[in-house]
UniProtKB/Swiss-Prot annotation:
Phylogenetic lineage: Bacteria, Pseudomonadati, Pseudomonadota, Betaproteobacteria, Rhodocyclales
Name of this protein: UPF0502 protein AZOSEA09860
Xref: InterPro entries: DUF480 (IPR007432), WH-like_DNA-bd_sf (IPR036388), WH_DNA-bd_sf (IPR036390)
Highest taxon of source: Bacteria
Matches recorded under Gene3D superfamilies: Winged helix-like DNA-binding domain superfamily/Winged helix DNA-binding domain (1.10.10.10)
Pfam families xrefs: DUF480
Family stated for the protein in its record: Belongs to the UPF0502 family.
Organism name: Aromatoleum aromaticum (strain DSM 19018 / LMG 30748 / EbN1) (Azoarcus sp. (strain EbN1))
């Protein structure tokens, strides 16, 4: 394609790990810190290197972030906003416009970009500051939409031995990067990984039970209101 976009129609997505992190940070901060958005390069560096909410944790330099921003601008995924009152330029993502993603899809995709492969329950919990999903079914619907785009933006990772929950990963790094991510997920289920995986499944089950309880409580309140 002469017009560079996020994906090539034949080969799919091909962003590198730094581009994915930088773009994910811009998407996240647009939700959680709207008063400080768009972001300066320094703010993007800080967001990229956070110790929480990031997997893997990275230690990017200002130069690496700036070069990634330049490449993303060339792909028309990021724009630089120069303001007369600002001493430095600031950057904003264009994913919503380029790929017609509503807020729920942006939130789920950003969560996958910043934290790696996750279950639908984990995505729901971890994306809460960006978008509050009513239940896991709502997350499943969003993941389905992202997986049906052309080229697809999300896919299910093959289950590791001994796991029940399906994990999902973004496809923005290309098919090979997705395969490597799946292998990393599977290799994480050694002695310690299996325990972490089981813990995650139990946490997921607790969240499911809470969802069901909330539904039952809501139905009971509606029933009781008929007699008041």
């Amino acid at each position: 394609m002469t017009d560079h976009t996020l994906a090539d129609a034949d080969e799919g997505f091909d962003l590198d790990s730094v581009e994915i992190r930088v773009l994910g940070v811009l998407m996240e901060k647009a939700f959680v810190t709207p008063d400080n958005y768009p972001l300066s390069v320094n703010a993007i560096v800080t967001g990229s290197n956070q110790l929480t909410g990031r997997d893997p944790v990275m230690n990017l330099t200002e130069t690496e972030v700036q070069e990634a921003l330049d490449r993303l601008i060339a792909r028309k995924l990021v724009s630089k906003r120069d303001q007369a009152s600002a001493r430095v330029g600031k950057y904003e993502h264009l994913v919503r416009l380029r790929h017609s993603l509503p807020p729920p899809e942006q939130a789920a995709l950003a969560t996958l970009m910043l934290r790696g492969a996750q279950t639908a329950g984990e995505i729901r919990q971890r994306s809460e500051r960006m978008h509050r999903f009513d239940d896991i079914a709502a997350v499943d619907k969003v993941l389905e939409h992202l997986g049906e785009k052309y080229p697809p933006m999300v896919a299910a990772v093959p289950k590791a031995p001994g796991t029940k929950e399906t994990r999902y990963a973004h496809l923005l790094g290309g098919r090979q990067a997705f395969v490597q991510m799946g292998e990393a997920v599977a290799s994480g289920y050694g002695s310690g990984g299996a325990v972490r995986g089981r813990t995650s499944e139990l946490e997921e089950e607790v969240r499911r039970l809470r969802d069901e309880f909330d539904v039952l409580r809501s139905e009971f309140e509606k029933f009781r209101s008929q007699f008041e």
